[in-house]
């Protein structure tokens, strides 16, 4: 030890306290998250900043974290650049516990106040930051070694140390991960991104303690290992084995995919679950290494606890190697995860508008059914309820007929009267059909050329060849003098739709919750 201190001077241990500071900062941040979601309340009078803070906006949260991280980063008495190069490396490792905490599914510390989807944006950007500073740490040292005037310092000499070789080995998957995390590459092959992501994480967690000097095994490796065990526990003990009861496909959803309904046995989920909850499905059993290496696939549950089966609506890519569910094959159902809809909305909302696009109907339908049942049973006064579904083509509406959980509801006019459909690519000129934005139109009357292509159900309105006009179509939704804090806009679908709904909700001063269906 004396020899080590003599060679490096007091700077060798200069970053240890900074690492403890980052760990302490992570703990404080988690406690603040707990307090924010347990004791703070969002109202229409809340500031825009506080709303973004509460909704875990990644820009707000990461800005706060980065300010706290870098305030003590520079210290005037530390004048050797290599001290800061090392500090970047220690920073990347000491942030991993916080990042792993954000990936817990479910999060035991915030079981009812947050869902794992709430943390995805923060986790995504924090992961990129960790990877970036780890890469920067490596590049700065390589640059320092290559440009040093000291004859005892060079890349060749430094790489004779196995610990430095480990650092170079970890650099390779980190560089690849940064490239694959770019949107177009990630969407092109999410599986490749996920594999590299897992490999890079495991290498960073378990090789860094060997590479780092001074060591980081205590307490960081111990904490990281405990969190990894918690993640593994969730993926082992909160699972069920199941086969498909039925699968029906609506072809030509778009050029590359088909719209599909899946029916699972009711036993796939526990006795009670939250409307619009998620499940994740893996084609492998937990003892198969591919169960851990490859991604599971998230789906929103269309059914309610009272149904006798579990329905899913999803798109399946027609590409050769795309993941698809098959009959007569066993799957692992991983947990059931709460949706992004706050408990306050489910328990106390009085005016609710649900807007969804495409397969976002899997989010909208269970929530609409949940609130409809509350109205039917007079459990609570709900003054306004509307479900709006936007589809590209009228044939997509046939998917409703294939849902076992809707077999009675679609025949109930009280249920469908507040269900409004927008068929965005329909050409009324070619069929001679006028826009039916009024109420009480029967679909088979609106499509005399092919009644069976939509079905004989009466909706509140069927709107052809256009998208929703927020202020016009929702003119009676917002009543500023009538409990605006219990007025909710819920949205699900492509990011463009969700962003439009969010802007409308923000402008109208109503509460908002959403899920975006994208990678």
Curated annotation (Swiss-Prot):
Instruction: Offer an example of a GO molecular function term for this protein.
Output: superoxide-generating NAD(P)H oxidase activity
EC number(s) per entry: 1.16.1.-
| Keyword list, A-Z | Electron transport, FAD, Flavoprotein, Ion transport, Membrane, NADP, Oxidoreductase, Transmembrane, Transmembrane helix, Transport
Give every Ferric oxidoreductase domain span.
88-207
Q: How does it sit in the membrane?
A: Multi-pass membrane protein
Gene Ontology CC: one annotated term: plasma membrane
Q: Which family does it belong to?
A: Belongs to the ferric reductase (FRE) family. AIM14 subfamily.
Entries under CDD domains matching the protein = NOX_Duox_like_FAD_NADP
Q: Which Pfam families match?
A: FAD_binding_8, Ferric_reduct, NAD_binding_6
Describe the location of the FAD-binding FR-type domain by residue ranges. Answer: 237-366
Q: What does this protein do?
A: Probable cell surface metalloreductase. May be involved in iron or copper homeostasis.
Please identify the protein, giving its name as recorded. Probable metalloreductase AIM14
Residues spanning the membrane:
16-36, 53-73, 91-111, 129-149, 165-185, 192-212, 214-234
For the keyword Membrane, the answer is yes
InterPro entries attached to this UniProt entry: FAD-bd_8 (IPR013112), Fe3_Rdtase_TM_dom (IPR013130), Fe_red_NAD-bd_6 (IPR013121), FNR_nucleotide-bd (IPR039261), RBOH/FRE (IPR050369)
Question: Which GO terms fall under biological process for this protein?
Answer: apoptotic process; reductive iron assimilation; regulation of actin cytoskeleton organization
Region forming the signal peptide: none
The record's subcellular location field reads:
Membrane
């Amino acid at each position: 030890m004396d020899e080590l201190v003599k060679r490096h001077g007091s700077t060798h241990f200069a970053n240890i306290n900074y690492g403890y500071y980052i760990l302490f900062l992570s703990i404080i941040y988690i406690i603040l998250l707990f307090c924010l979601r347990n004791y703070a309340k969002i109202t229409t009078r809340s500031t825009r900043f506080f709303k973004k803070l509460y909704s875990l906006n990644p820009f707000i949260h990461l800005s706060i974290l980065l300010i706290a991280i870098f305030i003590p980063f520079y210290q005037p008495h530390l004048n050797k650049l290599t001290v800061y190069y090392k500090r970047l490396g220690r920073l990347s490792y000491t942030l991993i516990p916080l990042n792993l905490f954000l990936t817990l599914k479910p999060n035991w510390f915030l079981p009812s106040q947050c869902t794992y989807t709430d943390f995805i944006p923060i986790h995504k950007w924090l992961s990129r930051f960790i990877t970036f500073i780890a890469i920067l740490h490596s590049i700065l040292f390589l640059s320092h070694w290559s440009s040093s005037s000291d004859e005892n310092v060079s890349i060749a000499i430094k790489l004779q140390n196995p610990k430095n070789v480990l650092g170079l080995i970890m650099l390779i998957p980190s560089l690849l991960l940064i490239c694959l995390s770019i949107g177009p590459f990630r969407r092109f092959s999410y599986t490749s991104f996920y594999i590299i992501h897992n490999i890079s994480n495991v290498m960073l967690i378990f090789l860094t303690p060997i590479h780092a000097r001074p060591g980081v095994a205590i307490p960081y490796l111990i904490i990281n290992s405990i969190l990894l065990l918690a993640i593994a526990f969730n993926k082992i003990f909160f699972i069920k084995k199941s086969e498909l009861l039925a699968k029906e496909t609506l072809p030509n959803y778009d050029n590359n995919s088909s719209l599909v309904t899946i029916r699972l046995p009711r036993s796939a989920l526990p006795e009670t679950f939250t409307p619009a909850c998620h499940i994740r499905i893996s084609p492998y059993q937990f003892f198969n290494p591919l169960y851990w290496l490859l991604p599971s696939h998230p789906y929103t549950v269309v059914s309610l606890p009272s149904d006798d089966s579990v329905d899913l609506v999803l798109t399946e890519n027609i590409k050769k190697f795309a993941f698809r569910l098959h009959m007569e094959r066993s799957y692992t159902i991983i947990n059931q995860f709460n949706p992004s809809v706050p408990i306050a909305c489910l328990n106390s909302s009085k005016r609710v508008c649900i807007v969804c696009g495409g397969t976002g109907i899997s989010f909208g339908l269970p929530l609409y059914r949940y609130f409809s049942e509350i109205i039917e049973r007079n459990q609570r006064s709900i003054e306004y309820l509307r479900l709006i579904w936007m589809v590209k083509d009228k044939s997509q509406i046939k998917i409703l007929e294939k849902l076992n959980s809707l077999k009675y509801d679609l025949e109930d006019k009280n249920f469908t009267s507040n269900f409004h459909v927008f068929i965005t690519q329909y050409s009324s000129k070619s069929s001679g059909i006028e826009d039916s934005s009024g109420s009480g139109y029967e679909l088979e009357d609106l499509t005399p050329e092919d009644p069976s292509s939509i079905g004989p159900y009466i909706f509140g309105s069927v709107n052809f060849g256009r998208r929703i006009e927020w202020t016009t179509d929702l003119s009676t939704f917002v009543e500023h003098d009538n409990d605006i804090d219990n007025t909710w806009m819920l949205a699900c679908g492509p990011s463009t739709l969700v962003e439009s709904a969010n802007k409308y909700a923000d402008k109208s001063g109503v509460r908002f919750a959403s899920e975006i269906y994208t990678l």
